[in-house]
């Protein structure tokens, strides 16, 4: 089967195409294999909301949940078994992509329990536990970029475990994430780990930034404010890429690179367009640059396949105009630190809520199976 030309062009421009979704249905029907073969998909990301949606639809998980119920498994153990099985199977499906890319792609992400977002020690313990349970080299453990998450990222990288840092909204936090990664690599080197085997991506959220800032611009309501709608998300991500180039062009990283260390690639997340007035491929076509990942919901993936115009690098040379966008936002009264604080709080809360819904639904299923 041939690859879609638009997505092949995106890959050729240095953007790894990952699917922001996973379910047993996708694995069992061959749908994920088809997307790998026809849509240039070379990775998969999951999150609590994705698993909650997967487990609440259809019957694909019923037999396993019933079997776990018969064995007396509690709800946490059940969810851990079910989700790690899916992730392990997806890792195996992407093993060829992992080998072919020397470990850069073919990656599948699984997130630590979102209720641990503000608990460093428990995050570290669960990250190590998930790494051991899934037991695949192409796994990435997702850890949120909260202030408690940062030292956990360093500690987990220091153990030689690959990490996807999630819920990054600001360039300032992105810099702290890159610093945490480098610190982790330095410790891993001291501990004798092979640095070339440690991989990381920094998941920078895009559309949610526009959603929050656009609402505030509409409240201000001036022509100047309204003219800035739909610009912040892309500008923010482009500034993050400039920060990435700076940090990984530094002497500090050069020393680690000499020992085989890899860059921490920026990953554009939250790339489904939420405002119908904007192009549905906006957060893909405007964020093309080498050494990046774009994880897309299937709707966005199909939109790019159908009509996404890939014209090469769309980030190079944009740092000054992107900074100008942020200067204008600040000048008309957008409180940017508050925006990023709200987005982080909402991001953690959203995942906690999905996790709780998943716990409740699974508990209901376990109870029903025991009757």
Swiss-Prot record:
GO term, biological process aspect, one: pentose-phosphate shunt
SUPFAM superfamilies: Aldolase
Keyword annotations: Cytoplasm, Isopeptide bond, Pentose shunt, Schiff base, Transferase, Ubl conjugation
One Pfam short name: TAL_FSA
Active-site residues, Swiss-Prot/TrEMBL: 142
Intracellular or extracellular location(s): Cytoplasm
Pathway as given in its UniProt record: Carbohydrate degradation; pentose phosphate pathway; D-glyceraldehyde 3-phosphate and beta-D-fructose 6-phosphate from D-ribose 5-phosphate and D-xylulose 5-phosphate (non-oxidative stage): step 2/3
Reactions catalysed according to its record: D-sedoheptulose 7-phosphate + D-glyceraldehyde 3-phosphate = D-erythrose 4-phosphate + beta-D-fructose 6-phosphate
EC number: 2.2.1.2
Cross-link (Isoglutamyl lysine isopeptide (Lys-Gln) (interchain with Q-Cter in protein Pup)): 132
A GO term from the CC aspect: cytoplasm
Gene3D superfamilies assigned to the protein according to its UniProt record, in alphabetical order: Aldolase class I
Family in the record: Belongs to the transaldolase family. Type 2 subfamily.
Name listed for the protein in its UniProt record: Transaldolase
Gene symbol of the encoding locus: tal
């Amino acid at each position: 089967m041939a690859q879609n030309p638009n997505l092949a062009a995106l890959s050729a421009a240095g953007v790894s195409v990952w699917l922001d979704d996973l379910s047993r249905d996708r694995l069992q029907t061959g749908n994920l294999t088809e997307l790998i073969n026809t849509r240039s998909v070379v990775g998969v990301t999951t999150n609590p909301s994705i698993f909650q949606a997967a487990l609440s639809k259809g019957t694909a998980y019923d037999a396993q949940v019933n079997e776990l119920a018969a064995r007396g498994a509690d709800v946490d153990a059940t969810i851990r078994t079910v989700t790690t099985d899916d992730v392990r199977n997806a890792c195996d499906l992407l093993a060829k992509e992992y080998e072919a890319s020397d470990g850069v792609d073919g990656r599948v992400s699984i997130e630590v329990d979102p209720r641990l977002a503000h608990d460093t020690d428990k995050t570290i313990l669960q990250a190590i536990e998930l790494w051991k349970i899934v037991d695949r080299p192409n796994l990435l453990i997702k850890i949120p970029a909260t202030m408690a998450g940062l030292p956990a990222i360093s500690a987990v990288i220091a153990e030689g475990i690959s990490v996807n840092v999630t819920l990054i909204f600001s360039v300032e936090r992105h810099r702290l994430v890159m610093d945490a990664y480098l610190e982790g690599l330095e410790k891993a080197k001291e501990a004798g780990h092979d640095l070339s085997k440690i991989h990381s991506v920094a998941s920078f959220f895009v559309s949610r930034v526009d959603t929050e800032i656009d609402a505030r611009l509409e409240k201000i309501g001036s022509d100047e404010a309204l003219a800035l709608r739909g610009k912040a998300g892309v500008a923010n991500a482009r500034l993050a890429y400039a920060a990435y180039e700076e940090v990984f062009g530094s002497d500090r990283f050069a020393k680690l690179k000499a020992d085989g260390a890899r860059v921490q690639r920026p990953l554009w997340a939250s790339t489904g367009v939420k405002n119908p007035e904007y192009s549905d491929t906006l957060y893909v076509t405007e964020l093309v640059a080498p050494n990046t990942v774009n994880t897309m919901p299937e709707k966005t993936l199909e939109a790019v396949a159908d009509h996404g115009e890939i014209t090469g690098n769309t980030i190079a040379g944009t740092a000054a105009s992107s900074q100008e966008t942020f200067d204008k936002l600040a000048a008309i009264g957008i409180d940017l630190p508050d925006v990023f604080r709200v987005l982080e709080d909402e991001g953690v809360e959203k995942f906690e809520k999905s996790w709780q819904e998943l716990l409740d639904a699974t508990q209901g299923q376990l109870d029903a199976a025991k009757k």
